[in-house]
């Protein structure tokens, strides 16, 4: 294929059969950020994420440690969720829960969850009080982007030194 044809693939969007994040379509490629230490070694991986909450699409980033499994943080930069309820995704106390949590268990199964009840300590984020649909949306979008239709293959390649 010619260069212009390959370049245009970057902007192609594909429909999703399994769409828990309610985004309808996703691009074939995404910009990821690899933060490096002064010595050039990998420090953090920052991945773009988005998905529907209650009133809006939440756009943000999830930062992972270099192992691609330990969460360093989650930040949304755009949303229109209800102030005092779903907009609590911006609350520093709620965001602090993400640091140190693990995406996957030792078998590589995606386990991270946003829920009212704690199932697995290393993988649990408390749901937002009074904002069930926003909490479900965050849970769904994180699972989507960290799963098979999202960045799972990239993260596995990263862990194997192939990314």
Where are these regions (language model features)?
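Structured beta-strand/loop patches that form or line metal/cofactor-binding pockets in enzymes
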Residues: 30-61, 78
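Intrinsically disordered, low-complexity polar/acidic regions
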Residues: 34, 40, 113, 117-122, ...
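Flexible, solvent-exposed short loops/turns enriched in glycine
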Residues: 51-58, 67-124, 128
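Hydrophobic alpha-helical segments, especially N-terminal targeting/anchoring helices
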Residues: 3, 36, 64-65
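Short N-terminal edge-element motif at the start of the domain
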Residues: 9-31, 35-36
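Single conserved hydrophobic/aromatic residue that forms the stacking wall/gate
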Residues: 1-7, 11
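Extracytoplasmic/luminal low-complexity segments enriched in Pro/Gly and acidic/polar residues
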Residues: 121-126, 130, 134-163
